[in-house]
């Protein structure tokens, strides 16, 4: 079994998407920006406590990176020289298998306490980020890719 030296970035579920467009009755209700991954990361850092980050948010592959080691791109680096968060996420990606992820969609329309009326069509479009944005590799000139097999709301 070939183990690749490529890991996934923190908050991987949300880093795979650069923009989330939400439509209600064919009218876009979200602002079209390419900063969804950054918003999701900041919302995760600021709105969740340590217990949530260590439990339910790991389903989106959120593992806290080691301070001062975020530029270490080799996920196999062990000990104090490596990034513990990258190493924890590498466990899931090292065999290039299927990873099941779960997490909320960080969009204002989903954070409201109001309910959606019956017969109002809801359409969510998840626009992918580049592979280079959501993967970290210590090797140069490699073509690692993320392939989505299924998605459910």
Set out the residue ranges of the language-model regions:
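Short, low-complexity Pro/Thr/Gly
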Residues: 1-153
